[in-house]
Amino acid sequence: MSEVKDRALRALQLMDLTTLNDDDTDAKVIALCHQAKSPAGNTAAICIYPRFIPLARKTLREQGTPEIRIATVTNFPHGNDDSEIALAETRAAIAYGADEVDVVFPYRALMAGNEAIGFELVKACKQACREANVLLKVIIESGELKEASLIRKASEIAIDAGADFIKTSTGKVAVNATPEVAEIMLRTIAAKGVQKQVGFKPAGGVRSADDAALYLKLADNILGPDWADARHFRFGASSLLASLLNAAGFNGATSDSNY
């Protein structure tokens, strides 16, 4: 197998195939489920708004891929600082049947100097997720934090509060995942010695097989070549799938999103 194809297949199996658009419909979510069962293998998960979870669960089961996980979003996309609302949304997502919850960290509170709000919000959501055996990913919105020190601090707080993954971005702001931010976040995981428990998810702007290969190379270099499995690494993306299928020698799939 060629190295290019090998890398593409590896990345495909680490995708959270995503649609988080205001105009999402049942038909679009069903199409996303079909795309997640690709000719080159299944993506790790799909990521959708909570209200579509029951439909997605039914579709994945009927197409013979119940193992594809369902991720959703809470406190999304603005990262407000009300822990009660974030917790209520997270509990509702769990009740809908989510396997994984991607919660937005209250990044503006951190930028204003308040570290406690983020810790308490993530801790509360983690407790709800732990009780339901649901994975918690924390979106720090790195493109808004901008400064390396804030990106590192948000990552540390999320990890200390129990995050199973730290995730770069919502995909709803001007700057989303970048290799520079990925390196900071991956090195934070390494520095805290939590690579067994905590994973990393770049999201937004990861569109090509070459992009994906660059992020995986970073993970391999910083945390070891065997670290980036589906429990420790995901890509939040939609248009990436077509590029990966093309690189792997399959006809490209289409996507309505540019996430």
Swiss-Prot record:
GO CC annotations, alphabetized: cytoplasm
Keyword tags: Cytoplasm, Lyase, Schiff base
InterPro entries in the cross-refs: Aldolase_TIM, DeoC, DeoC/FbaB/LacD_aldolase, DeoC_typeII
SMART domains registered for this protein in UniProt: DeoC
Subcellular compartments: Cytoplasm
A Pfam family this chain is assigned to: DeoC
Entry-linked Gene3D superfamilies: Aldolase class I (3.20.20.70)
Pathway note: Carbohydrate degradation; 2-deoxy-D-ribose 1-phosphate degradation; D-glyceraldehyde 3-phosphate and acetaldehyde from 2-deoxy-alpha-D-ribose 1-phosphate: step 2/2
Keyword Magnesium: no
Chemical reaction(s) catalysed: 2-deoxy-D-ribose 5-phosphate = D-glyceraldehyde 3-phosphate + acetaldehyde
EC number(s) stated in the UniProt entry for this protein: 4.1.2.4
Record has Cytoplasm as a keyword: yes
One biological process term in Gene Ontology: carbohydrate catabolic process
GO MF assignments: deoxyribose-phosphate aldolase activity
Active site: 102, 167, 201
Family, per entry: Belongs to the DeoC/FbaB aldolase family. DeoC type 2 subfamily.
Function: Catalyzes a reversible aldol reaction between acetaldehyde and D-glyceraldehyde 3-phosphate to generate 2-deoxy-D-ribose 5-phosphate.
PANTHER family, alphabetized: DEOXYRIBOSE-PHOSPHATE ALDOLASE (PTHR10889:SF3)
Name used for this protein in its record: Deoxyribose-phosphate aldolase
Natural source organism: Erwinia tasmaniensis (strain DSM 17950 / CFBP 7177 / CIP 109463 / NCPPB 4357 / Et1/99)
Lineage summary: Bacteria, Pseudomonadati, Pseudomonadota, Gammaproteobacteria, Enterobacterales
